[in-house]
Amino acid sequence: MIDADRLITAAGGRDRDEQMDRAIRPLSLADYIGQPTVREQMELFIQAARGRNEALDHTLIFGPPGLGKTTLANIIAQEMGVSIKSTSGPVLERPGDLAAILTNLEPNDVLFIDEIHRLSPIVEEVLYPAMEDFQLDIMIGEGPAARSIKLDLPPFTLVGATTRAGMLTNPLRDRFGIVQRLEFYNIADLSTIVSRSAGILGLVIEPQGAFEIARRARGTPRIANRLLRRVRDFAEVRGNGQITRQTADKALNLLDVDEHGFDHQDRRLLLTMIEKFDGGPVGVDSLAAAISEERHTIEDVLEPYLIQQGYIMRTPRGRVVTRHAYLHFGLNIPSRMGEMPVVDDVVDDPADL
């Protein structure tokens, strides 16, 4: 199983880290760094909804973990000047669980459902009329005496977040008027995020120190902030408390996070594909068995960044490593791979951005 304390996983961390994440989380679109298209569109939609004094259209936010889906949901509520009620798909086990939340919403409030793809079908059925007509259908009684009653709900905005938009049913997906995909962040934006977080936490950090952390953060703000906290520990214990590029480099090397942002889990996945499956193609179930991981861990946690950086390809026959992976480990590239082009995404200096 994947390590619970894996530094570069984008999953939620320990309670203390989560508290610090909340402290450095932006509260407005003006403070929201990166995702320029999403930010510009949401500014427009929110301004229009506020001008009409209406609830914002239901909004679906999807993308890999750690890119700020929850942050954006809270910003939407803040910008709309309304309250937000937060829950998650697995928590809503029965229609009554959802009904209890919906009936306590005020006009134009935001209901945020994380992992919305994990809603049970019976709960999802209750959600349809609530989203479309702002009505709640409730069954009273049991057996032949059971009857349905309709309750009117105040207008509200459902914000759904998911890492697996393809698992949403078509009827649910079609009821979202706004759909936003969050992309991996570039190093420049991540450097800005690291510098901002350091300022909020009262840390002294040089621009190149922020850059060094950012380039190893796998394009993910949550990972960047987590690495910042661990580099801070290193700087306080083995340095003078100031985060320089040299300090960040030493700290991250000690933590086994290389210049590509890979840790031992990523390297194990790539080496398993190369050594046990001759580079692929290999099915995800076979790969999961070989490295003793669950299928969804590979698909949701390990693969997205490796694919985005060009180390793995998905093909109809299975996963295949690219020339990038062989070069990363200093291995000879099999002649059968041909002359595929190599694109080096590692930036060695901030001036190259």
Swiss-Prot record:
<feature type="binding site">
    <location>
        <position position="175"/>
    </location>
    <ligand>
        <name>ATP</name>
    </ligand>
</feature>
<dbReference type="InterPro" id="IPR008823">
    <property type="entry name" value="RuvB_C"/>
</dbReference>
<dbReference type="InterPro" id="IPR036388">
    <property type="entry name" value="WH-like_DNA-bd_sf"/>
</dbReference>
<keyword id="KW-0547">Nucleotide-binding</keyword>
<dbReference type="GO" id="GO:0000400">
    <property type="term" value="F:four-way junction DNA binding"/>
</dbReference>
<dbReference type="InterPro" id="IPR027417">
    <property type="entry name" value="P-loop_NTPase"/>
</dbReference>
<feature type="region of interest" description="Large ATPase domain (RuvB-L)">
    <location>
        <begin position="4"/>
        <end position="185"/>
    </location>
</feature>
<feature type="binding site">
    <location>
        <position position="69"/>
    </location>
    <ligand>
        <name>ATP</name>
    </ligand>
</feature>
<keyword id="KW-0227">DNA damage</keyword>
<feature type="region of interest" description="Small ATPAse domain (RuvB-S)">
    <location>
        <begin position="186"/>
        <end position="256"/>
    </location>
</feature>
<dbReference type="InterPro" id="IPR008824">
    <property type="entry name" value="RuvB-like_N"/>
</dbReference>
<dbReference type="InterPro" id="IPR004605">
    <property type="entry name" value="DNA_helicase_Holl-junc_RuvB"/>
</dbReference>
<feature type="binding site">
    <location>
        <position position="295"/>
    </location>
    <ligand>
        <name>DNA</name>
    </ligand>
</feature>
<keyword id="KW-0378">Hydrolase</keyword>
<feature type="binding site">
    <location>
        <position position="222"/>
    </location>
    <ligand>
        <name>ATP</name>
    </ligand>
</feature>
<dbReference type="Pfam" id="PF05496">
    <property type="entry name" value="RuvB_N"/>
</dbReference>
<feature type="binding site">
    <location>
        <position position="66"/>
    </location>
    <ligand>
        <name>ATP</name>
    </ligand>
</feature>
<protein>
    <recommendedName>
        <fullName>Holliday junction branch migration complex subunit RuvB</fullName>
        <ecNumber>3.6.4.-</ecNumber>
    </recommendedName>
</protein>
<keyword id="KW-0233">DNA recombination</keyword>
<feature type="binding site">
    <location>
        <position position="314"/>
    </location>
    <ligand>
        <name>DNA</name>
    </ligand>
</feature>
<dbReference type="GO" id="GO:0048476">
    <property type="term" value="C:Holliday junction resolvase complex"/>
</dbReference>
<dbReference type="InterPro" id="IPR003593">
    <property type="entry name" value="AAA+_ATPase"/>
</dbReference>
<dbReference type="Pfam" id="PF17864">
    <property type="entry name" value="AAA_lid_4"/>
</dbReference>
<feature type="binding site">
    <location>
        <position position="70"/>
    </location>
    <ligand>
        <name>Mg(2+)</name>
    </ligand>
</feature>
<keyword id="KW-0234">DNA repair</keyword>
<dbReference type="GO" id="GO:0006281">
    <property type="term" value="P:DNA repair"/>
</dbReference>
<dbReference type="GO" id="GO:0016887">
    <property type="term" value="F:ATP hydrolysis activity"/>
</dbReference>
<keyword id="KW-0238">DNA-binding</keyword>
<keyword id="KW-0067">ATP-binding</keyword>
<feature type="region of interest" description="Head domain (RuvB-H)">
    <location>
        <begin position="259"/>
        <end position="353"/>
    </location>
</feature>
<dbReference type="GO" id="GO:0005524">
    <property type="term" value="F:ATP binding"/>
</dbReference>
<dbReference type="GO" id="GO:0005737">
    <property type="term" value="C:cytoplasm"/>
</dbReference>
<comment type="function">
    <text>The RuvA-RuvB-RuvC complex processes Holliday junction (HJ) DNA during genetic recombination and DNA repair, while the RuvA-RuvB complex plays an important role in the rescue of blocked DNA replication forks via replication fork reversal (RFR). RuvA specifically binds to HJ cruciform DNA, conferring on it an open structure. The RuvB hexamer acts as an ATP-dependent pump, pulling dsDNA into and through the RuvAB complex. RuvB forms 2 homohexamers on either side of HJ DNA bound by 1 or 2 RuvA tetramers; 4 subunits per hexamer contact DNA at a time.</text>
</comment>
<feature type="binding site">
    <location>
        <position position="24"/>
    </location>
    <ligand>
        <name>ATP</name>
    </ligand>
</feature>
<feature type="binding site">
    <location>
        <position position="25"/>
    </location>
    <ligand>
        <name>ATP</name>
    </ligand>
</feature>
<dbReference type="GO" id="GO:0006310">
    <property type="term" value="P:DNA recombination"/>
</dbReference>
<dbReference type="InterPro" id="IPR041445">
    <property type="entry name" value="AAA_lid_4"/>
</dbReference>
<comment type="subunit">
    <text>Homohexamer. Forms an RuvA(8)-RuvB(12)-Holliday junction (HJ) complex. HJ DNA is sandwiched between 2 RuvA tetramers; dsDNA enters through RuvA and exits via RuvB. An RuvB hexamer assembles on each DNA strand where it exits the tetramer. Each RuvB hexamer is contacted by two RuvA subunits (via domain III) on 2 adjacent RuvB subunits; this complex drives branch migration. In the full resolvosome a probable DNA-RuvA(4)-RuvB(12)-RuvC(2) complex forms which resolves the HJ.</text>
</comment>
<feature type="binding site">
    <location>
        <position position="71"/>
    </location>
    <ligand>
        <name>ATP</name>
    </ligand>
</feature>
<feature type="binding site">
    <location>
        <begin position="132"/>
        <end position="134"/>
    </location>
    <ligand>
        <name>ATP</name>
    </ligand>
</feature>
<feature type="binding site">
    <location>
        <position position="70"/>
    </location>
    <ligand>
        <name>ATP</name>
    </ligand>
</feature>
<dbReference type="InterPro" id="IPR036390">
    <property type="entry name" value="WH_DNA-bd_sf"/>
</dbReference>
